[in-house]
Each structure stands twice: as structure tokens, then as C-alpha cells.
UniProtKB/Swiss-Prot annotation:
One GO CC annotation: cytosol
Quaternary state and interactors: Monomer.
Cofactor note: Binds 1 Mg(2+) ion per subunit.
UniProt-annotated binding residues for Mg(2+): 15
Coiled-coil regions listed in the entry: none
InterPro entries assigned: P-loop_NTPase, Shikimate/glucono_kinase, Shikimate_kinase/TSH1
Organism: Azobacteroides pseudotrichonymphae genomovar. CFP2
Protein name stated in the entry: Shikimate kinase
Pfam entry (one): SKI
Family the entry assigns: Belongs to the shikimate kinase family.
Primary localization: cytoplasm
Length: 170
């Protein structure tokens, strides 16, 4: 039985890395945000806006528990906030290997500026505002992220190099 949980801030590459990692390790792949969108037939931002953060975090927790109960031999890409609520981080650590994909503030900011249309929380922010948004959120979240079994530093390298460097650590 093998479960690998990828955690980290938005823009760290959890979904992209997760898909490739799963393929290389011959495991299944699931993205918790995608799973929630399919289950509830709504975008994450719509659930967040319509139901509130507390309700969304409960949904996220329920989906995480369901995935753990139903699937083995899988790479799971979590939402950026998933480890930071309830006992989700403890649950993931007890149920598999957790990998914090840690990127620098500069790299996260650069990636988020390039994809800001797809990220409603930052779509109206300037590059400087995005940088401070990332800094403020990371300060709160790193307490949880750093509880991961593996902290893997994402640098400006090819996806192939990232996977080749990550696989031996898992």
C-alpha cells in the first residue's frame, strides 16, 4: 500500500508534478480540488464564495478522508490549504508519505503572476500585491507544511529534473 500526498502553496506544481510522478511510479493520481469540483459540480471559488470558508474546509476534509479510505497506491495532490485545517496534516502523515513541494517566494510569485487569470484570489492583484499575498499566506501555512515527511525544494529546473531528484527521496 502506497499513498503519496503532495502539499504546498498554489503554484508550487502539485498537480503537474503529481501526474508525472504517478505515471513514473505506476500509481493512480487524484487532485483533491478536481475531485471536489466534480463531486459538487461547482468551481472551488464558487463553493468558497457561496458556502463560506468553514463549509469548504469541511468538504475538503470529508473528501480527503474518503480518498484515504477508498484508494491505495496513489499520488494525491491536495489543495494549498488542506494541511492547515482540522487534523488533515496528521491524517495524511499517518496514512502515507507527505511531500512538501517548497518553492521560493520569488518563484511562486512569478508562477502566480503568469497564471493569475485562473486564480480568482489574485486575479485583480498587481505583481507586488501578489508577492505580499504569498508572503502573508506562507507565514501561516508553513507551520503545517513543514510537518511533511519530506520537504522538497522546487527550484527553477525542468519538470524532468524535478521528478528525477524527487523520486529517490520518496
Amino acid at each position: 500500500m502506497r499513498r503519496i500526498f503532495l502539499i504546498g502553496y498554489m503554484g508550487a506544481g502539485k498537480t503537474t508534478i503529481g501526474k508525472i510522478l504517478a505515471e513514473k511510479l505506476n500509481l493512480s493520481f487524484i487532485d483533491t480540488d478536481f475531485f471536489i469540483k466534480n463531486r459538487y459540480k461547482k468551481e472551488i471559488t464558487d463553493i468558497f464564495a457561496g458556502e463560506g470558508e468553514e463549509k469548504f474546509r469541511r468538504i475538503e476534509q470529508k473528501i480527503l478522508q474518503e480518498i484515504i479510505q477508498k484508494w491505495e497506491n496513489i499520488v494525491i495532490s491536495t489543495g494549498g490549504g488542506t494541511p492547515c485545517f482540522f487534523h488533515n496534516m496528521e491524517l495524511m502523515n499517518a496514512s502515507g508519505t507527505t511531500v512538501y513541494l517548497k518553492a521560493t517566494i520569488e518563484l511562486l510569485t512569478e508562477r502566480l503572476i503568469n497564471m493569475k487569470c485562473a486564480r480568482p484570489l489574485i486575479k485583480d492583484k498587481s505583481p507586488e500585491e501578489i508577492k505580499y499575498f504569498v508572503i502573508n499566506n506562507l507565514v501561516k501555512r508553513e507551520l503545517f507544511y513543514n510537518q511533511a515527511s519530506i520537504v522538497f525544494f522546487i527550484k527553477k529546473m525542468t519538470m524532468n529534473d524535478i521528478i528525477e531528484n524527487l523520486m529517490p527521496k520518496i
